[in-house]
Amino acid sequence: MSILAEKLSSILKRYDELTALLSSAEVISDIKKLTELSKEQSSIEEISIASKEYLSVLENIKENKELLEDKELSELAKEELKILEIQKSDLETAIKQLLIPKDPNDDKNIYLELRAGTGGNEAGIFVGDLFKAYCRYADLKKWRVEIVSSSENSVGGYKEIIALIKGKGVYSRLKFEAGTHRVQRVPETESQGRIHTSAITVAIMPEVDDVEVSINPSDLKIEVFRAGGHGGQCVNTTDSAVRITHLPTNISVSMQDEKSQHKNKDKALKILKARLYEKQIEEQQLANAKDRKEQVGSGDRSERIRTYNYPQNRLSEHRINLTLYSLEEIMLSGNLDEVINPLIAHAQSQFE
């Protein structure tokens, strides 16, 4: 038996053990144990199904090879072996993907943060354009998008947008979007037709609960102030806006979208926890980088990961040297899989 077959047999054995345990009275009466074992079984269910199929194909190959000695059945066995070898190859490819260590955050919802960088108003306009593309992509994936906070500029763009995206596998699909996105195009206000270069930053932060990120209340500085509108005008006569600063890291979050101070505080605290968790992930990635052949990207906001060149209808993904000449179609349709799928494939290849 090959090393792969032995590994798959042990996975199947464990899956059967878990099935038996989950039906035992002892486990059923222990909610904590039941949840723990159910989670473990769920995590190996897909690989178990593929393993069963793969081992069955190996057995069929063995039987058909024995039939090659039979004059009457040898031709039939040859044809059957051709089909089985293709099935074996396809299953091995799928199984290799399933055996790649899963990112524990892959099933989490995310906070998506887009922030205008260099380029003034044009950067702010692109924040809105890219956010719309992400919303269209979310629609295609049947995810839900909820704007948590937004700050508009004077020309219809945004200084910043923070949104909560909920759905199956959100983090697994969008985690590689973190970094600096550069846009090159002719602004509508540009009479000479000159191309301007602007940049925005994207942060992808997994939504976390109190268990994953615990904050000591004494580490927080909470300030309240009146919410302001465009040009500094006051839009609220009460101190409903909230700023929370985590003193050990100096990470700060301000929130004024809600009329209620309590709601603003709750939103700000959730985003603060997500940012602290994001910081932990970045530190882990840097520590683990030595053990990886290459990283798709550090997730660092300062890393320039992609260029959107509108005059050439070109999207360049710098981390994997991918160039697509369908920029406008991708932005309008929201079909970001054209970029995301190659990024995921590249990341997975680093584990092979």
Curated annotation (Swiss-Prot):
It is found in: Cytoplasm. InterPro entries: PCRF, Pep_chain_release_fac_I, Pep_chain_release_fac_I_sf, Prokaryotic/Mito_RF, RF-1. Gene3D superfamilies: 3.30.160.20, 3.30.70.1660, 6.10.140.1950. Residues 288-309 are annotated as: Disordered. Pfam families: PCRF, RF-1. The keyword Protein biosynthesis applies. Residues 289-306 have a biased composition (Basic and acidic residues). Signal peptide: none annotated. The modification N5-methylglutamine is found at Q233. One of its GO terms (molecular function) is translation release factor activity, codon specific. Coiled coil: none annotated. Methylated by PrmC. Methylation increases the termination efficiency of RF1. It comes from the Bacteria. SUPFAM superfamilies: Release factor. One of its GO terms (cellular component) is cytoplasm. Keywords: Cytoplasm, Methylation, Protein biosynthesis. SMART domains: PCRF. Peptide chain release factor 1 directs the termination of translation in response to the peptide chain termination codons UAG and UAA. Belongs to the prokaryotic/mitochondrial release factor family. This is Peptide chain release factor 1. It comes from Helicobacter pylori (strain HPAG1). The lineage of its organism: Bacteria, Pseudomonadati, Campylobacterota, Epsilonproteobacteria, Campylobacterales.
